[in-house]
A protein has these predicted regions:
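Short beta-strand-to-loop acidic/aromatic patch adjacent to the donor-nucleotide binding site
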Residues: 66-81
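Hydrophobic helical membrane-anchoring modules
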Residues: 1-4, 8-12, 32-33, 157-230
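A conserved acidic beta->alpha catalytic loop
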Residues: 19-28, 80
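Short beta-strand/loop segment that forms part of the nucleotide-sugar
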Residues: 11-21, 42-44
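Conserved beta-strand segments of alpha/beta enzyme cores
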Residues: 14, 38-40, 135, 185-187
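Acceptor/aglycone-binding surface of glycosyltransferases and processive sugar-polymer synthases
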Residues: 39-61, 70-72, 84-165, 196-204, ...
């Protein structure tokens, strides 16, 4: 699917996949894809979770570019819930001048898992002003495109220190708070999710995610708001 989309889109690309200590034959499947795709596979022997995987992927994308002002990293799940069909609109928005573009999740008639519906309903009340002050309408979505120069500026300040420490959707909010001070312009484009074709049960946990959102609000976003008013 990625190959078809990118061929029609007409952009050079490389797929970077993170195999988070999988035990379900993922490595064998990826080996077959490497024969037909420009693909690089990162692996770990011990599971590091969603925030660690996202950070590894973004750091690797930055390490592999010679043109950070031009090149773009698009993050999407490899379990088919996020469709490659949305890559082109995300990239087009970056090429149109944005530094970060978020895929804002839209209803498509296919219900989200109950725990996710609960978390999405509670999160705006839990986050309060933090949710309303976010530069995009869906700060919880992880389906995003980043101009790599923004990540380069992030790593200039963070160095080897991890910039993501919170699990699940909370990590998406945390990452938005990390990159926002370095982005001149942020945008969004509508995307839809397909949890009905997910190959394995979701690891999403609503209560853990909501607790993480509270921590991110205190440690990342409230600090960001204070810096804006200083």
């Amino acid at each position: 699917k990625v190959r078809k989309v990118m061929k029609e889109f007409g952009r050079d690309y490389e797929v970077i996949v993170f195999d988070d200590a999988s035990t379900d034959g993922t490595r064998e499947v990826l080996e077959r894809y490497r024969r037909v795709l420009p693909m690089r596979v990162l692996t770990t022997e011990r599971r590091i979770g969603y925030p660690g995987a996202v950070e590894r992927l973004l750091r690797e994308a930055l390490n592999r570019t010679s043109y950070p002002k031009r090149d773009i990293a698009v993050l999407l799940q490899a379990d088919f819930t996020e469709s490659p069909d949305h890559i082109a609109p995300l990239v087009n928005a970056i090429e149109g001048g944005a530094d970060v573009v978020v895929g804002a999740v839209q209803a498509n008639g296919i219900p989200l898992p109950r725990s996710m519906r609960l978390a999405r309903w509670v999160a705006p009340f839990l986050l309060g002003r933090t949710f309303g002050s976010a530069p995009v309408s869906d700060p919880l979505s992880g389906f995003r495109a980043y101009r790599l120069i923004v990540l380069k500026k992030v790593l200039r300040d963070f160095g080897d220190r991890p910039f993501l420490t919170t699990e699940g959707w909370a990590a998406n909010l945390e990452l938005l708070g990390v990159v926002a001070p370095y982005a001149r312009r942020m945008g969004e484009t509508p995307v839809s999710l397909r949890y009905d074709i997910q190959a394995r049960p979701s690891r999403f946990r609503a209560i853990r995610t909501l607790r993480g959102l509270l921590r991110v609000r205190r440690e990342r976003w409230e600090g960001l708001e204070r810096r804006k008013t200083d």
